[in-house]
Amino acid sequence: MSDNVSEGLLAEPPFSKEAAVDPATASHDRGAGGQATTFAVVITSYNYRDFVLEAVESALAQSRKAVQVIVVDDGSTDGSDALLREHYAADERVTLISGVNGGQLSAFQRGVNAARAEVICFLDSDDRWEPAYLAHLGALYDTRADIDFVFSDLQLFDQQDRVMKFHDHAVDLGYTAISTYVLTQWYGAPSSALSMRARWARQALDLPDSFQRTWRLSADNCLVFGCSVLGAHKYYLPTGCVRYRIHGANGWWSNESPRLEYINKMTSSALIQHYAARVGMGPECIEFSKLEFMTKPRPPWKETKRYVRLVMMRRVSPWRKWERAVNILRRGWRLRG
């Protein structure tokens, strides 16, 4: 789970104004073939014997069924692997993968490699979903073929009780490559609220072996930063269906400190630079900030101000900076979501 909870390359997709999607009324048809989007769930687990069955059962209990529920046990030493095999070895709905401990990035890669669905959803083994979660996602993915990456809000439970959210309502974020590259902006959520089309998960997790040690924890950064910089079209969809457990043994939550925050910022910056190098992205991309902003149909006011900051960082005359900033402010105010 990542400690970046806050508030790709350009094209011209057919945007529509965003709205919360009702899974009860939205069609599951997509495209001329009328096929519903297929989902695979990747659950990664390490020494969470007390919680992992609850996570798996929540994935199996979805009103819209996943075609695969893949559980990757990352070398647990607390009997988790045996417990999983006791319950699911004969269950055709569940694919069990086990091996030596390699960390979260390695577990993500193993799970994604086994996925055979169009969209991959991630679930940490100490969290759980409400039964309508995949139905909410499916209603969006089915009707918006241009959307690549969707993240949700989270309801904290156990030792805390509050909601973590990006915005008050659904937001079509368009493209986020430049904002991520220049500002290290994090457009995402912890793993259990992340989903993306399979090709984006594979691209984001296609990393050198040397990254395994760095991202033993907080590998959701690889998904969030990678998909942004590589060019995914992102969407925030509050579902109210993701339960995020705070229990004192969370990988990073229980170990926050200024030192770890510093290390996370530095490693995140290096990660972003790696993805940028793959697509030939450099500092000159800031000149296209306005174009990226134009891909957002109804940007929240905070997002508008973020892009004003970007255009003011351009190496041009003050007059040209302000001219573009005013244009962004006008558009953002008119369309604000």
Where on the chain are the PLM-derived regions?
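Detector for methionine-enriched segments
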Residues: 1, 164, 196, 205, ...
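Membrane-interface aromatic/basic loop that binds lipid-linked glycans or pyrophosphate carriers
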Residues: 1-18, 284-337
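Nucleotide-sugar donor-binding/catalytic module of glycosyltransferases
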Residues: 2-260
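Short N-terminal secondary-structure initiator segments
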Residues: 44, 51, 178-199, 282-296, ...
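Short, isolated positions within intrinsically disordered regulatory regions of eukaryotic proteins
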Residues: 52, 92, 132-133, 204, ...
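Short, surface-exposed, charge-dense and proline/glycine-enriched linear segments
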Residues: 129, 178-186, 242-249, 266-275, ...
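Soluble, non-transmembrane catalytic domains of enzymes that act on hydrophobic metabolites at membranes
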Residues: 258-300
